Design a protein with these regions (language model features):
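Catalytic cores of the polymerase beta-like nucleotidyltransferase superfamily
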Residues: 1-309
């Protein structure tokens, strides 16, 4: 059947003939079938395309992309994941049909971008931007081209890579807000929170000592600091991650969860309400500065002394 909104068939038509079914596939390498008796059906030379490491649309690429504009992102994703080259006519059609991508649901675009982001060739995202596939989300042209390839050197976690990518775009003038960009693409709450935290942290210089790192971790949490460190290192060509990981590896306390005393312990001293919360914060600050003293007896004695004085 015909397609509506450049993304969905208006009706699902049962295709009886295999060749007719294969003719509706996106790329020739995906238009190959193997019958139950082992007979290979390859009417569009998909095997040859795989041998040549080439991504080529089945039939007219303009028609394929008008049927479903997401196929343009898929072409880039396969290129990034497999290292295949997109042939000229398909590239030309992507350039021509790029405005259709604005009609795609943000969730579908996000999912394809994430798959590209997690490959060993995240610089393919720069190609998507250059073609104008993300014009709905990135309306402007930056003053310099970020080195997206640097993202490949960091941990392959969606959270870290999304935050770093969005902050790079903001840093180089492509978008006004990293957080707003991720929000438009319908990223989850955890990613949005970490992005907002990272943006705030990146307004300052990186900590120069262990105590500074622990204070950051205490305020923002491990996930947010990890994202800020990744973005900071990529943008500035530094290696703060080494210091950050050393602090985590040390096992020293930077959160109430790892403090040797709890709120229940302080209740026994008669503390309650706001006073109890303030005392826990005081003890945490003390332990971050003197990590060897994170012992229940020492902290209870300190709390008692502080309360009496």
């Amino acid at each position: 059947g015909s397609y509506r909104d450049h993304r969905r068939p208006e009706s699902v038509t049962f295709v009886s003939e295999l060749i007719s079914d294969l003719s509706r596939r996106d790329f020739t390498m995906n238009a190959i079938a193997l019958s139950a008796d082992g007979m290979l059906s390859d009417p569009f030379d998909g095997v040859q395309a795989i041998r040549e490491r080439t991504i080529r649309c089945v039939g007219d690429p303009m028609l394929r992309f008008n049927e479903d504009a997401l196929r343009m992102f898929r072409a880039l994703r396969f290129s990034a994941r497999l290292g295949f080259t997109i042939e000229y006519e398909t590239v030309a059609a992507i350039s021509e049909c790029a405005p259709l991508a604005a009609e795609l649901a943000p969730e579908r675009v996000r999912d394809e971008l994430e798959k590209i982001l997690l490959t060993t060739r995240p610089e393919t995202l720069g190609v998507a931007i250059k073609f104008g596939l993300l014009r709905r989300y990135i309306p402007g042209n930056g003053w310099a081209s970020p080195n997206y390839a640097d993202i490949a050197s960091m941990t392959r976690k969606p959270l870290t890579r999304w935050v770093t990518f969005s902050i790079m775009l903001q840093k180089y003038g492509y978008i006004p807000s990293a957080h707003a960009f991720l929000e438009e693409l319908r990223l989850d709450g955890r990613t949005l929170r970490c992005c907002a935290d990272a943006e705030e942290m990146l307004k300052c210089e990186a900590p120069t000592d262990k105590l500074g790192w622990k204070k950051l971790l205490s305020r923002y949490g491990v996930d947010s600091v990890a994202c800020a460190v990744a973005a900071y290192d990529v943008i500035n060509g530094l290696n703060c991650e080494k210091e950050f990981k050393a602090v985590l590896k040390s096992g020293e306390c930077f959160s109430l969860k790892h403090l040797a005393v709890s709120g229940d312990d302080l209740l026994s001293l008669g503390l309650k309400g706001p006073e109890l919360g303030e005392m826990l914060k005081f003890l945490l600050d003390y332990v971050m500065e003197y990590p060897d003293n994170n012992k229940r007896e020492i902290l209870l004695e300190l709390a008692k002394y502080s309360e009496e004085s």
